[in-house]
């Protein structure tokens, strides 16, 4: 689960991290009052969407030369004008895709005198099985370019879970970031704070980009992105309350309600599969034959007819879907249950695109019989390779 920047900063501030003062607003009418709560005279007006690259993003409704989703304001009047310009419009960034995201809230923040911009994140490094700090002296908006062009400038420091962030760890991180004087002292305090927040709140990612050294030599968290492990949210009621469903894909919200593992993608072939590994293999083979999957969807091993029906309806609700591939290897999952669920969904929502079904495993003959006797125009496939070729051919004509 993701949260907004202002929510992430409030959370980190509660753990003791150095964060600038700021106020979240939901309408331009609130902009003046928000700015007056801050010291000034420099302000930053930040679009709050669940996507990176806001500073270099562009608003669909504004001219191409208009400023992006993060703007500097040198007066309260500038804050108000920028708020009116940004709220309600659609911000397109590298991470939103061409559809963009509507900006429904802004964060008005006190400006900072920046000397250096650094990058810091905390994540689970699966290569070593530990939580790790990933840091770089090349912070700011272009960290993706740094990672691609000069990966040697990105340093990883793994943390022993039994010891937490030790003095040696802090020294290693500070050395990697080339911190000196007051900034180094601040780092020795900040790194354990961020690690504590990451562990206690079951985060999947904590990204500070940039972490800045100000002209007075002190450290400050200038931007923050936090994602939480969805499997641990049951023990964090305070975090669940921060969820903004308007930032999430409606289909993914529906899938969550039925305990379906669904991720929307940019392709045109919908997939319904049981098992994450088989689902990924199905997406790979669709791509191998020259098409793109529209989603990842794992119905799980113990899906009911109702669950399968819901999954099919979620797929068909995507206007980009031009064909559907159902690929089931029945172990715990029974092929006849899949067949009944698909037919129930088709009868309810109709079948306007080609449908290829590949069934194998438990009750496979019964499942095929149910589909064959349905009278529906369903294309049967013998194996995964055959299924992928048939759905790609049906879509491309």
Swiss-Prot record:
Residues 9-254 form the ATP-grasp domain. It is an enzyme of class 6 (ligase). This is Succinate--CoA ligase [ADP-forming] subunit beta. One of its GO terms (biological process) is succinyl-CoA metabolic process. It catalyses: succinate + ATP + CoA = succinyl-CoA + ADP + phosphate; GTP + succinate + CoA = succinyl-CoA + GDP + phosphate. Its cofactor is Mg(2+). Gene3D superfamilies: ATP-grasp fold, A domain, ATP-grasp fold, B domain, Succinyl-CoA synthetase domains. It comes from Rhizobium rhizogenes (strain K84 / ATCC BAA-868). Keywords: ATP-binding, Ligase, Magnesium, Metal-binding, Nucleotide-binding, Tricarboxylic acid cycle. Belongs to the succinate/malate CoA ligase beta subunit family.
């Amino acid at each position: 689960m993701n949260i907004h920047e202002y929510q992430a900063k409030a959370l980190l501030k509660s753990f003791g991290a150095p964060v600038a003062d700021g106020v979240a607003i939901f309408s331009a009418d609130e902009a003046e009052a928000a700015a007056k709560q801050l010291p000034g005279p420099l302000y930053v007006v930040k679009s709050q969407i669940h996507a990176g690259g806001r500073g270099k993003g562009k608003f669909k409704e504004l001219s191409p030369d208009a400023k992006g989703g993060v703007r500097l304001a040198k007066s309260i009047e500038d804050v108000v004008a920028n708020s009116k310009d940004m709220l309600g419009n659609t911000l397109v960034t590298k991470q939103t895709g061409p559809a963009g995201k509507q900006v429904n809230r802004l964060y008005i923040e006190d400006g900072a005198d920046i000397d250096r911009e650094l990058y810091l994140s905390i994540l689970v490094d699966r290569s070593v099985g530990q939580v790790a700090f990933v840091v770089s002296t090349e912070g700011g908006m272009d960290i993706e370019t740094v990672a691609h062009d000069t990966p040697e400038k990105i340093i990883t420091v793994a943390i022993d879970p039994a010891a937490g962030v030790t003095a040696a760890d802090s020294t290693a991180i500070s050395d990697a970031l080339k911190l000196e004087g007051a900034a180094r002292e601040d780092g020795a305090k900040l790194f354990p704070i961020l690690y504590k927040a990451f562990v206690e709140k079951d985060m999947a990612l904590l990204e500070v980009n940039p972490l800045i050294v100000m002209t007075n030599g002190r450290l400050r968290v200038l931007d923050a992105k936090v994602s939480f492990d969805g499997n641990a949210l049951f023990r964090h009621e305070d975090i669940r309350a921060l969820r903004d469903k308007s930032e999430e894909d409606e289909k993914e919200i529906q899938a969550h309600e039925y305990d379906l593992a669904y991720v929307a993608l940019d392709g045109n072939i919908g997939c319904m599969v049981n098992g994450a590994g088989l689902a990924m293999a199905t997406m790979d083979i669709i791509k191998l034959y020259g098409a793109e999957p529209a989603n990842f969807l794992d119905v799980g091993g113990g899906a009911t007819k109702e669950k399968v029906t819901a999954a099919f309806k979620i797929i068909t609700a995507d206007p980009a879907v031009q064909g559907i591939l159902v690929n089931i290897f029945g172990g715990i999952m029974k092929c006849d249950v899949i067949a009944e669920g698909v037919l129930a969904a088709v009868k309810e929502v109709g079948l306007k695109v080609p449908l290829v079904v590949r069934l194998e495993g438990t009750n496979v003959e019964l499942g095929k019989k149910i589909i064959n006797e349905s009278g529906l125009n369903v294309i049967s496939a013998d194996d995964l390779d055959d299924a992928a070729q048939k759905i790609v051919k049906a879509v491309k004509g």
